[in-house]
Amino acid sequence: VLLVAADPAFDGHDPGPGHPERVARLRAVAAGVAASGLEDAVVPLAPRDATRAELGRVHAAALADVVEALSARGGGVVDADTVLSAGSYAAAARAAGAGLAAAEALERGEGTAAFLGVRPPGHHATGSRPMGFCLFNNVAVTAAALRTGGARVCIVDYDAHHGNGTQEIFWDDPDVLYVSLHEWPLYPGSGRLDETGGGAGDGATCNLPLPAGATGDVYQRAFDEVVEPLASRFRPDWVLVSCGFDAHRADPLTGLALSAGDYGALARRARQLSPGPGRTIVFLEGGYDLDAVRDSVAATLPALVGEPAEPGEAPTAGGPGDDVVDAAQLRWSAEEA
């Protein structure tokens, strides 16, 4: 059983005409769910709002105050990328709570995995600042809640952009392993190979900054030689995935070269990092070509429940990035030694 979250509240966040992070993205997600061939396995999950206390585990109270105040007066501009409307606080609180609802449902044994079609996305939001289309850090809110119960959490982020907010929030936490595969150089400018965490969390952050044109075979090597060995040593209780479909070769904002077939393979590999069924939650982050989002969702969902995907785009190969994987493998194998 795959739990899939959707909610009308997400439509209430409107950053304005021409903004790439638009409501139509969720229509593409819904089309991908319909095309996945999992009609009999998908169970709707009703999200709930994250409370101020739950947001407060990762965000300063002032951040939530700003989002709520701007929404209450009909909207406003945080920065050139991050624009709010009257419904933005409600959408963001519901998006941040979707992962909490998913974790609660999975802990009750109600599903094998969960896919959360939420917006606004979250991984750029820092502890104190909304940015990069993101208001609250959805994956971080869920990880922090799981941590209160003593769980060790692995966050795998394969959005094309580095999740600077998630990295910052868990920078010194040894019980949250944050792994990001992203395009470099690209917004927001963080995520270098030598950014590995600090204090007690040194070694619990792993970045693989890949060049434009990187293909699925490079990602598979990264999982084989870096991500899986790291996760195996870390032994997570939960795996949370920041899944941006903007690494697809058709995406208008980025230069990576993945296909829908590659996204299916990535979801399968991410699920295999978890200790067993019912411990994987996938959060929608970026992805701005609607056809690519639809096709990538259709390939992702079967992988989360161990089903073969419908025939679609083949996995890709032949792009650059092996040198980055080589360097990361050398760095992290030295860490193991």
Model-found features: residue ranges?
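A general "terminal functional-core" signal
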Residues: V1-A5, D11, D65-A337
